[in-house]
UniProtKB/Swiss-Prot annotation:
This is Fasciclin-like arabinogalactan protein 5. Residues 224-239 have a biased composition (Low complexity). The keyword Transmembrane helix does not apply. It comes from Arabidopsis thaliana. Belongs to the fasciclin-like AGP family. The gene is FLA5. Glycans are attached at residues 26, 74, 126, 159.
Length: 278
């Protein structure tokens, strides 16, 4: 009995390990086999989700064709990772199980819910059946159920299933959960730079300078010159000064007349003396 129990335990361990390896490898192989899912395969590799999926033994991947998934390829790598995680269901579903649904609507847990960042049910999906058709959408309130089931691409019962849907599912608020708003920017005014007194600008004109008179340029004072006082016009002579000047002018005339008389007398005496000699 002990030997049989040991063999059973060993077989179970090998099966679990093998199943885990098959899950990771089959995801890559399944996407490589179908070229119409090459974009989604590249996104799974780019966002390093293959290793995260490898931790689970039972999953269902909602695959989207290259044309349909192009609507989200321009998002950031973090947003792409979150969106792709909502396309990984932590349960097994294939066409048989979907068509055999008893309830009209079922809530599904996705890989994104395991991150602890889920808000308002955006880590869950809703699958509903209506008139023989199956639709997927976010479990967030009022989210549309517009991703329709197309077909089962790959299935390994109760281990791995890859099913195609018509369009990607973008749950509201995924980016908000990853990118919290930054703290508000506080503007700090710079300290004023001390200025040297020599470079301080002169005060502006006073308020009175705004009057109309201030618009007329003022004539600067004439510079002082060394011009002698004689250059300035002489004052008008008074009556007394005129008399004195007239007297001064008359004196030379009197002297001249006296000198003339003396000369005549000398000539007369000389003439008389010449007669006396005879």
């Amino acid at each position: 009995m002990g030997l049989k129990a040991s063999l059973s335990l060993l077989s179970l361990t090998i099966l679990l390990v093998f199943s885990k390896v098959v899950t990771a490898n089959n995801i890559t192989l399944a996407f490589q086999k179908y070229s119409k899912f090459s974009t989604m395969r590249d996104l799974f590799i780019k966002t390093k989700l293959i290793a995260a999926i490898d931790k689970y033994q039972t999953i269902t991947v909602l695959a989207v064709s290259n044309d349909a998934i192009s609507s989200i390829t321009n998002r950031s790598e973090v947003e792409l990772r979150n969106i792709l995680m909502t396309h990984v269901i932590l349960d097994y579903y294939d066409e048989l199980k979907l068509q055999g649904m008893r309830e009209k609507s079922i809530m599904l847990t996705t890989l994104y819910q395991t991150t602890g960042l889920g808000e308002q049910m955006n880590g869950f999906l809703n699958v509903s059946k209506s008139k023989g058709r199956v639709y997927f959408g976010s479990e967030v309130k009022n989210s549309p159920l517009n991703a329709e089931y197309v077909s089962t691409v790959y299935h390994n019962p109760y281990n791995l299933s890859i099913i195609q849907i018509t369009m990607p599912i973008v749950a509201p608020g995924l980016s908000l959960a990853i990118f919290p708003p930054p703290p508000p920017y506080v503007h700090v005014a710079p300290y004023p730079t001390p200025m040297d007194a020599s470079v301080v600008p002169a005060p502006g004109p006073a308020a009175d300078d705004n009057s109309p008179d201030s618009a007329v340029p003022k004539t600067p004072p004439a510079p002082a010159t060394d011009t002698p006082e004689a250059d300035s016009p002489a004052p008008a002579p008074s009556a007394d000064n005129e008399k004195i000047e007239a007297a001064d002018k008359a004196k030379p005339s009197s002297s001249a007349s006296k000198a003339g008389w003396s000369f005549d007398v000398i000539l007369l005496l000389a003439f008389l003396a010449s007669f006396a000699g005879f």
